[in-house]
Amino acid sequence: MDLTVTHITHKETYKEPRDDDDDKQVVAEIMARSFIPTLITTIPWEGFHFAGHEIQITEGKDCYGAFVWPSALVLCYFLETHAKQYNMVDKNVIEIGAGTGLVSIVASLLGARVIATDLPELLGNLQYNISRNTKMKCKHLPQVKELSWGVALDRNFPRSSNNFDYILAADVVYAHPFLEELLMTFDHLCKETTIILWAMRFRLEKENKFVDKFKELFDLEEISSFPSLNIKLYKAMKKNRRSA
């Protein structure tokens, strides 16, 4: 099917927003990576340009995790524009709360070995999106696995076999009752050398409280901020690392 789309060019180096004008410019560039197809198809989808590929994402209407949220676009943009600093090639990566799979797809296209995880009711659409966008395009075929935060972690993700270089997360903190379980999951999946890259949109006081609790277990660094979106991008590693 021939779809007319606009391909986006971008800078090779990324600059942190310094003021409102810079913030708006970078945010506009990030948001321009998405597009709506010009033809109506039987299965509606939204398009994105990352890692040199057109990515087609099917969203849902029944739950929060079935949409592509701005935090996911911010994290995808960061991974692409920081590919040298945070090299994904052959790295072991897990995404928690993968939702539609966009972040996992981009990490896979950048060369990572990816496990995309979410709740069981989201896995069908997640698998569909990942398969259609990574087959014959990626060095490593991504896996899709169920992960309910805080549930059966030792059985499904035993610490002895967790060897993740990166944990990716976008918009996993919001008004849900599982923040303690989310923190437990971050802690369980992390080893001393694991890097967490986490994009977060601040909406309510709950987000600030979670960050405070997160800091009790992890060294947290704000590496980028997008005030017009109320989104911050964090890098984190476990506290009290022997290598620190």
Swiss-Prot record:
S-adenosyl-L-methionine binds at residues 69, 97-99, 118, 149, 170. Keywords: Methyltransferase, S-adenosyl-L-methionine, Transferase. The keyword DNA repair does not apply. Residues 9-18 have a biased composition (Basic and acidic residues). It comes from the Eukaryota. Coiled coil: none annotated. Its EC number is 2.1.1.-. GO terms for biological process: methylation. One of its GO terms (molecular function) is protein methyltransferase activity. Residues 1-20 are annotated as: Disordered. Pfam families: Methyltransf_16. Belongs to the methyltransferase superfamily. METTL21 family. Protein-lysine methyltransferase. This is Protein-lysine methyltransferase METTL21E. It comes from Mus musculus. The gene is Mettl21e.
